[in-house]
Regions:
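Short beta-strand->loop
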Residues: 99-106, 118-122, 145-148, 214, ...
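Extracellular/periplasmic bilobal clamshell ligand-binding domains
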Residues: 295-330
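A ligand-binding cleft/hinge motif common to bilobed small-molecule-binding domains
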Residues: 88-92, 208, 212-233, 282
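Periplasmic-binding protein-like
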Residues: 112, 126, 186-190, 196-197, ...
Length: 330
């Protein structure tokens, strides 16, 4: 009887494992989204309550790392959804052929420039900015050119554009301001740079530990300190040239093992439950008209929004990264 019992037990285990795999939604995202203090746990709990499934967040360093991982795995990716790319990576991500169209109605999104893309669903947006401590700096730079060209008293930390969407955002921000003169600008910024980190979390932690005067982040970052910590000493430097806008997006992987669950989650992204987790979970603006928490009204609002088209970024990104790299090795 024992061999028979063993076979029954093995069949039960196999069946259970198969059921678990069929009911697990795998989402590639970045580390701060999936972290205990990020929006991931709250979103996971909310979606699992309606899907009768398990949500498995696979945390990578940053948005560019997500795209790099997807490319590396190709058609063998375990991801059902990628969440954490941004508007600047969309064209490049589409060219992989690894993503498929969504069936989500995005008509009610409230993005500054609207939304009509059929592959990507937006889930939050914000503007890149340099955060500083007002108790340590009374006179922040009032423009990118002031920071780069005249403020030799300041030390900066930012992220690598090859692995980080904020780092890429700074690269695009610098290019939009300096154009053909950007190499010289990078060289000047290099003399003020403490380090270039792989992702946002490492950079921001170093700044909070006092290792720099400024850190590349978002205009919404001070809201975290104000709301979560009741600390009003952090602010962002408002630059006269304007600030580069980022829209973060999610997409369904073409080879998704759990296609129906993926479709369900893609629609869930624009629900009030998901969107209300963005301001105080991801510390970004929601893309629908959910109410913003008290404290967001104190944030600096850029006087101008800067951007390149996704197609232009896809065409020029490698060249602009080489510009950045060559400037750092002068």
């Amino acid at each position: 009887m024992k061999p028979t019992l063993n076979l029954i037990a093995l069949a039960a285990i196999t069946s259970t494992s198969a059921f678990a795999a069929e009911n697990t939604l795998t989402i590639y995202t970045y580390d701060s989204f999936a972290a205990d203090w990020g929006p991931g746990p709250k979103i996971e709990q909310a979606f699992e309550a309606i899907c009768s499934c398990d949500v498995n967040f696979v945390a990578l360093d940053d948005g560019v790392s997500i795209l790099n991982r997807l490319r590396l795995e190709g058609g063998n990716s375990k991801a059902d959804i990628v969440l954490g790319l941004d508007n600047n990576l969309m064209a490049e991500a589409k060219k992989t052929g690894l993503l498929t169209e969504h069936n989500v109605d995005t008509a009610n999104t409230v993005l500054p420039n609207g939304w009509s893309d059929t592959t990507f669903v937006p889930y939050d947006y914000g503007y890149f900015a340099f955060v500083y401590n007002t108790e340590k700096m009374a006179n922040p730079p009032k423009s990118m050119k002031e920071l780069v060209e005249t403020r030799d008293d300041l030390k900066v930390i930012y992220q690598d554009p090859r692995t980080s969407t904020p780092g890429q955002g700074l690269m695009l921000w610098m290019k939009s301001i300096y154009g053909d003169d950007v190499t010289q600008a990078w060289q000047k910024l290099a003399s003020k740079t403490v380090t270039v980190t792989k992702g946002w979390s490492e950079a921001y932690s170093m700044f909070l530990n006092g290792e720099s005067d400024l850190v590349l982040s978002y205009t919404t970052s001070p809201a975290y300190h104000l709301i979560a910590e009741n600390d009003s000493k952090f602010a962002t430097a408002n630059f006269a040239e304007g600030h580069y806008m980022q829209v973060e997006v999610a997409a369904k992987v073409k080879g998704a093992k759990n296609s129906e669950l993926a479709d369900q989650f893609m629609n869930f992204i624009l629900s009030d439950e998901f969107q209300s987790a963005m301001p105080t979970g991801n510390w970004m603006y929601p893309v629908t008209d959910v109410e913003l928490p008290k404290g967001f009204e104190t944030l600096s609002v850029p006087n101008k929004s800067l951007s390149f088209s996704a197609d232009e970024v896809a065409k020029m990104r490698k060249s602009w990264i080489r510009e950045w790299q060559s400037a750092l090795t002068f």
